[in-house]
Design a protein with these regions (language model features):
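N-terminal secretory signal peptides and thylakoid transit peptides that target proteins
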Residues: 1-22
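N-terminal active-site segment of His-dependent metallophosphoesterases
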Residues: 30-103
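A short C-terminal boundary segment appended to hydrolase-like catalytic domains
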Residues: 40, 296-358
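Active-site-proximal beta-strand elements of phosphoester/diester hydrolases
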Residues: 43-56, 171-180, 214, 275-280, ...
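Active-site environment of divalent metal-dependent phosphoester hydrolases
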Residues: 55-58, 96-100, 123-131, 181-184, ...
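His/acidic metal-ligating clusters that form di-metal
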Residues: 77-87, 172-174, 186-275, 331-332, ...
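Extended active-site neighborhood of metal-dependent phosphoesterases/phosphodiesterases
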Residues: 100-200, 270-276, 287-291
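Active-site/pore-lining binding-face segments in mid-to-C-terminal subdomains
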Residues: 256, 260-309
Length: 358
């Protein structure tokens, strides 16, 4: 690594921390309450890694497979330099397509984290239903085997794909799984009736605590293409309205939900008292991870770039612009105007650092 690479990366990190610190000073108290009977806690810092899509035999395209292992390794090293991280949440699509060998590779890196890390599965974390999508030289795991492989990182010996954890008194984590591993065509999602009832029960029983909700798929849409019937509708839940209804009913206890899957820059929407975040992908442009600080009163964030070379980041941006499917329908053809519109959605640079009340 040359001095220019190092100084640029350190400048971005230091600048991001300075802005985040300002946001925290403005919006966070030392202890705050959700209600007079709520459990107080000091602000908590945590990180989110999403859509690493690690592939030990891949080539760079829209998904930067050839450097995917390096992206995880560098991100782990950078997160280990963050101060006072309570945990790291990995919000699905750890693998390219359910390969055991890729699972071993990413776990090797994640196990180097000094903060505890928790995992939930995405639609690429189990064996493809269609044998044509299975590559020679790899062995494949079912979603049940994925859960067992990452047992102890959120998953328990029960084998259930969803779970809750107590982070500290007053703060809990709820991980949901809407994947459809036996669906032969769609890569979308739906939360089972059992899981929806469980979620409602969890939030009812912990109404005086703050519950952070995580899921790979999205509760809300981020572009017109994701509406029902659109070419990207499966980025969201089939029964998103049912899930949002439960969260809205418990908005005081579950004011924040964070998803991955969409591969765009960090963004949020507030719906009926709940703030829904989308976390950026580690493996495709803009190749970022996220660090949050939360209290009962507010949430602040930064989304640093993965610490790979400038040439890697430029290649990732060019590969995104070449990937026609990933472009919005109205900007499908490349032009200066259309390319700028595509990058605006995927980079969302105005949200690299920010904060909001919850």
């Amino acid at each position: 690594m040359n001095a220019m690479d190092f100084s640029r990366r350190e400048f971005l990190k230091l600048g991001g921390m300075s802005l985040l610190g300002t946001a925290i000073n403005l919006n966070f108290g030392t202890k705050v309450f959700a209600s007079p009977t709520g459990t107080p806690f000091d602000p908590v810092r945590f990180a989110v890694i999403s859509d690493a899509h690690i592939d030990i035999k891949g080539k760079n395209a829209m998904k930067m497979s050839a450097i995917s292992s390096k992206c995880v390794e560098r991100t782990v090293a950078d997160l280990n330099r963050e101060k006072e991280l309570a945990f790291v949440m990995v919000t699905g699509d750890l693998l390219l397509d359910g390969e055991v060998e890729n699972a071993k590779e990413i776990k090797k890196h994640l196990d180097q984290l000094t903060a505890p890390y928790y995992v939930l599965s995405g639609n690429h974390d189990y064996v493809p239903v269609d044998p044509k999508n299975r590559r020679e030289g790899f062995t494949y795991m079912t979603i049940e085997e994925f859960v067992k492989f990452f047992s102890g990182h959120g998953y328990s010996d029960s084998g259930k794909r969803y779970y809750s954890l107590q982070i500290k008194p007053g703060l809990r984590l709820i991980a949901l799984d809407a994947c459809l591993p036996l669906e032969p065509v769609k890569w979308g999602a739906a939360l089972s009736e059992e899981q929806l009832k469980w979620l409602d029960h969890q939030l009812t029983g912990h109404a005086n605590e703050l519950n952070l909700i995580f899921m790979h798929h999205n509760f809300v849409s981020w572009s017109a293409d994701e509406q029902a019937g659109g070419p990207k509708q499966w980025f969201g839940l089939d029964n998103a309205a049912d899930a949002r209804s439960i969260l809205s009913k418990h908005a005081n206890a579950a004011p924040v939900a964070i998803s991955g899957h969409r591969h765009i820059g960090l963004n949020y929407k507030e719906v009926d008292g709940v703030t829904y975040f989308i976390a950026p992908a580690l493996n495709s442009h803009p190749m970022r991870y996220s660090v949050f600080t939360i209290s009962h009163q507010a949430i602040a964030w930064k989304t640093p770039m993965v610490s790979v070379s400038e040439s890697n980041h430029v290649e990732a941006r060019e590969n995104l612009l070449k990937a026609k499917w990933w472009r919005a329908t109205q900007y499908e053809e490349s032009s200066s105007f259309n390319d700028a519109a595509v990058l605006e959605l995927y980079e969302n640079n105005g949200m690299i650092v920010g904060s909001k009340k919850i």
